[in-house]
Amino acid sequence: MTELAPKASPAHSIARVLVIDDSAVARGLMTRWVEEDSDLTLIGSAVDGEQGLRKAEELKPDLIVLDVEMPKMDGLAALPLLLKAVPGCKIVMASTLTRRGGEVTIRALSMGAADYASKPQAGRLAGAEEFRRDLLLKLKALAPRPIPPVPTQRDMAPSPAPATPAAPGAPVARSITPPPPPSSSAPAKKAFAPVAQPPQGRGTPRNTARPEIIAIGSSTGGPQALRDVIAAFPADVRSPIVIAQHMPALFTKILAEHLTKAGKLVCKEAEDNERLKPGCVYIAPGDFHMTIRKDAAGFYAVLDQTPPINFCRPAVDPLFQSVAEVTRGAALGIVLTGMGHDGREGARMLRSVGGTILAQDEATSVVWGMPGAVAEAGLADEILSLADMGPGIVRRAKGGN
């Protein structure tokens, strides 16, 4: 078979990409999409894991798109070898939206894959515009980019409000952009009012009591981060834990099963109007937003299919905003690795009523988008490595600070 010679990298290209897929149709489409994108450079393609490994060792790509099911050496077998051959390379699994595809994808993420893109099943790839957008977006989000460090809220000394307009480039409080109105077929849901960020260093005092709810948001790199965090929890956690992880339907159910095996807590997909139990982990099902309501008996999960927020459903912002409303600040919000800025405005609202916000650090995040947005807005009470995040949450879950 003729080897694909790498094309010259354009000056503004941000990443060099290798595509490994045994399907000629899928491989052809993905290589064409990468070639057409000026931010990416296609350096090669391969038909199975063995050939892909040889090319990876030779070409040293920044990013690899790796199919799951292949002859000779499948994606799961090739994954650890590729990670060893090209340290620092980010691998995106290309998997189908099936139970088998979901199982393998979650396993791959736990083994070190950075993310996944859900491709249509065979015969439907010709019109796979959503797959194209998703794949290219994730490849560019995973491309190596230096991001300067930012201070945590704890590092910021109290200061009086400025008497003059802020200098150019100074942080500006942003209001929440309301989602578009729901379609006629979707149930009407309560809108959350925008909350401006209090002046830095002069916000509502932090609530250091045991949180009534622990809320976690994550996206790219989230499954592995969640696994590490949940594994750190003891069996006697007294707060319910609610999670919004950007994932499609079916995959979130499989994720819950894997998280249950990883630690001492029971993890499950949340059900509509399900009462939250202390020490249980509830994951927003794929394609549903999850918010929290409260009555005299306790807290309940509420699911809806109102339009995506921040291009996501489930989204982190509505979850955090609802937690802020029902707990009035007696809550802990955690923003883990992920691309974009989902969770920033929810963290702003939660913090404005006295809640505590933790963000994952840049060094251990697969993509420092979501936690970086929270940190850069001055909303993080603490920025922690993934290794420190679980113990940090547990400490605060017991009423520590």
Curated annotation (Swiss-Prot):
CDD domains: CheB_Rec (cd16432), REC_CheB-like (cd17541). The active site is at residues 219, 246, 342. GO terms for molecular function: phosphorelay response regulator activity; protein-glutamate methylesterase activity; protein-glutamine glutaminase activity. Residues 205-400 form the CheB-type methylesterase domain. Residues 166-176, 185-199 have a biased composition (Low complexity). It catalyses: [protein]-L-glutamate 5-O-methyl ester + H2O = L-glutamyl-[protein] + methanol + H(+); L-glutaminyl-[protein] + H2O = L-glutamyl-[protein] + NH4(+). Its EC number is 3.1.1.61, 3.5.1.44. It is found in: Cytoplasm. Residues 16-134 form the Response regulatory domain. GO terms for cellular component: cytoplasm. The modification 4-aspartylphosphate is found at residue 67. Pfam families: CheB_methylest, Response_reg. Residues 146-208 are annotated as: Disordered. Gene3D superfamilies: 3.40.50.2300, Methylesterase CheB, C-terminal domain. Contains a C-terminal catalytic domain, and an N-terminal region which modulates catalytic activity. Belongs to the CheB family. This is Protein-glutamate methylesterase/protein-glutamine glutaminase. It comes from Maricaulis maris (strain MCS10) (Caulobacter maris).
